[in-house]
């Protein structure tokens, strides 16, 4: 009994000692969060049928505020360690000065300010994947041959909101930044920065009408070109890129209506950068020319408020801006929220891919997503 009493007194003294230690304010503002996306997908393409379970995404983040600064670090864990496209990697690492609403300054690695859909959390985006044009022209599995960068790059950005109406709601948002142009976790190759920016108006609550622009380059330093195999000198090849996007969205009362058109002018490397040797391959992809574009239109409608949603999307991408190379997807499905942190998504897609001998095939996708 005496031992128990002594132990209890010691525990009390230790606890009291810790209680007197005042931790820095910023420690109390640090938050651990993350999300996971599990997936089943079946593809019924002729002579290429597949069905598989998959971990689409698993991310863990730390973020917090100290004074006027907000910071975030996020890591993606799923994938293998053999390719850049699916290896575990840092996706976000930035700090932003947020003293003024009309002027916030961000530096580090973060989302490129291009299109409405790119900066969205993939669970909130609502479908089995981002729109094809967003994937190909905003830095995911990019048309230019860059490694998978989840729409991100390293740089510095200014953004802000202003022109408040009588209700105190801002009517105008802008964002503009300078970036390396090489995607995540990569230094610049050609010392030419990408200038990317957007501006949108919000005439009524829930509505955004925006325009985005992007000018810059994607470059490689290497010594192999299939079009000139005898030239083994190490050299830098720069591919100029010019892109723009027109975007519209209305989101209110559980409804989401969104559409975007994206166009790109600029050549592409033939081999996608997946491993170190790919970065030295300077061969140009002449098969898709120097233009590409696409667009999508989607609707998400509440069936049971905050619980069950019906959705549909029309999604088109043309790798060379010609209709005879178009890949069109007609999608419909349902999203169900078990709780605010657990969501089940299911959809059917009819695909018309004019790049294939057999244009038409179907897909089924189901995802169970969770947040913490």
Predicted segments, located by residue:
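Residue-level detector of intrinsically disordered/flexible regions characterized by low predicted structural confidence
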Residues: 4-5, 61, 262, 315
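Sec-dependent N-terminal signal peptides
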Residues: 4-13
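Outer membrane beta-barrel
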Residues: 21-181, 189-196, 200-209, 296-302, ...
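Outer-membrane beta-barrel pore domains
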Residues: 46-47, 94, 109, 118, ...
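Surface-exposed cleft-lining segments at the edges of enzyme active sites
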Residues: 180-184, 230-233
């Amino acid at each position: 009994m005496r031992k128990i009493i002594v132990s209890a007194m010691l525990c009390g003294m230790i606890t009291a000692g810790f209680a007197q230690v005042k931790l820095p304010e910023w420690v109390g503002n640090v938050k651990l969060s993350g999300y996971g996306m599990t997936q089943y997908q079946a593809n019924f393409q002729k002579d290429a049928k597949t069905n598989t379970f998959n971990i689409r995404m698993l991310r863990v983040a730390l973020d917090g505020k100290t004074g006027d600064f907000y910071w975030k670090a996020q890591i993606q864990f799923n994938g293998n360690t053999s390719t850049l496209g699916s290896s575990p990697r840092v996706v976000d690492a930035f700090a932003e000065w947020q003293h003024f609403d009309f002027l916030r300054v961000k530096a580090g690695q973060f989302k490129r300010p291009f299109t409405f859909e790119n900066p969205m959390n993939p669970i909130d985006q609502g479908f089995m994947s981002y729109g094809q044009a967003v994937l190909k022209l905003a830095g995911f599995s990019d048309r230019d041959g860059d490694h998978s960068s989840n729409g991100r790059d390293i740089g510095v950005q200014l953004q802000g909101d202003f022109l408040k109406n009588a209700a105190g709601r801002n009517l105008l948002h802008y964002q503009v930044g300078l970036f390396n142009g090489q995607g995540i976790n990569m230094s610049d190759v050609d010392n030419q920065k990408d200038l990317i920016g957007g501006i949108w108006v919000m005439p009524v609550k829930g509505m955004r009408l925006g325009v985005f622009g992007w000018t810059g380059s994607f470059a490689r330093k290497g010594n192999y070109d299939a079009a000139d195999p005898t030239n083994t000198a190490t050299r830098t090849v720069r591919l100029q890129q010019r892109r723009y996007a027109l975007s519209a969205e209305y989101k209110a009362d559980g409804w989401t209506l969104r559409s975007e058109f994206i166009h790109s002018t600029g050549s592409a490397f033939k081999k996608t950068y997946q491993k170190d040797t790919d970065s030295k391959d300077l061969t140009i992809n002449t098969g898709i020319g120097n233009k590409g574009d696409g667009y999508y239109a989607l609707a998400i409608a509440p069936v049971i408020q905050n619980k069950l949603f019906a959705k549909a999307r029309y999604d088109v991408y043309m790798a060379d801006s010609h209709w005879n190379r178009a890949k069109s997807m007609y999608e419909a499905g349902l999203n169900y929220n078990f709780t605010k942190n657990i969501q089940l998504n299911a959809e059917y897609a009819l695909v018309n891919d004019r790049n294939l001998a057999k244009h038409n095939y179907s897909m089924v996708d189901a995802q169970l997503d969770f947040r913490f």
